Amino acid sequence: MAETKEFKTLYNLFIDSYLQKLAQHSIPTNVTCAIHIGEVIGQFKNCALRITNKCMSNSRLSFTLMVESFIEVISLLPEKDRRRIAEEIGIDLDDVPSAVSKLEKNCNAYAEVNNIIDIQKLDIGECSAPPGQHMLLQIVNTGSAERNCGLQTIVKSLNKIYVPPIIENRLPYYDPWFLVGVAIILVIFTVAICSIRRNLALKYRYGTFLYV
């Protein structure tokens, strides 16, 4: 897998932005993780998984930074697609990032209903790359069932949208013709990803890595 070209999605840009924001706010991430990710399941093809612990005590700020990163990344998309994806995830683009989103409310309810004590299972949906390429999926364990739920929801949506090399390191970019071209490329590669998917029940179990 190391000899193949990396295949990036909007989720890669999102998680890079999220980690940068955590670092910029000097949030201590050395607190004991109350929640561990026990399993990661989904559809995998040419996908490598990395679990990173970034456990912290400030849940509100962490969710705010998560929403900020999401809004920042989908600014690459046309207005119609931005709003469709945001609505699917449960984030109101007209609200300030610090507002309690529908996503956060849903994840609070999810954690309460499932009574997660210390081990959490994540279903990330799809992680697929074309032949000759690989995808590196970085999952951040925030140490909170609610925040992990938020990341799980975001990865399911953003990890299906391919990022052409021309838009890497160019966030944000608002040229209309550029966005039209990006939208066309995203549609083409989304279809390509769908054509190569296959099912695998388990990708990661706590303490054990499985590569496909």
UniProtKB/Swiss-Prot annotation:
What is the taxonomic lineage of the source species? Viruses, Varidnaviria, Bamfordvirae, Nucleocytoviricota, Pokkesviricetes
Which stretches of this protein does UniProt put in the Virion surface compartment? 1-175
Residues crossing the lipid bilayer are 176-196
Subcellular location field: Virion membrane
Query: InterPro entries, alphabetically?
Result: Virion_mem_poxvirus_L1
Q: Spell out the disulfide connections.
A: C33-C55, C47-C127, C107-C149
Q: In which organism is this protein found? A: Vaccinia virus (strain Western Reserve)
One GO CC annotation, please? viral envelope
Q: How does it assemble?
A: Component of the entry fusion complex (EFC) composed of OPG053/F9, OPG076/O3, OPG086/G3, OPG094/G9, OPG095/L1, OPG099/L5, OPG107/H2, OPG143/A16, OPG104/J5, OPG147/A21 and OPG155/A28. Except for OPG095/L1 and OPG052/F9, each of the EFC proteins is required for assembly or stability of the complex.
Question: What is the official name of this protein in its record?
Answer: Entry-fusion complex associated protein OPG083
In the bilayer, the protein is annotated as:
Single-pass membrane protein
Family according to the record: Belongs to the orthopoxvirus OPG053 family.
What does its PTM field state?
Answer: Disulfid bonds are oxidized in the cytoplasm by OPG088 protein.
Induction (free text): Expressed in the late phase of the viral replicative cycle.
Q: Which UniProt keywords apply?
A: Disulfide bond, Late protein, Membrane, Transmembrane, Transmembrane helix, Viral envelope protein, Virion
Q: What's the name of its gene? A: OPG053
Q: What does this protein do?
A: Component of the entry fusion complex (EFC), which consists of 11 proteins. During cell infection, this complex mediates entry of the virion core into the host cytoplasm by a two-step mechanism consisting of lipid mixing of the viral and cellular membranes and subsequent pore formation.
Q: Does the keyword Transmembrane apply?
A: yes
Q: Which residues lie on this side of the membrane: Intravirion?
A: 197-212
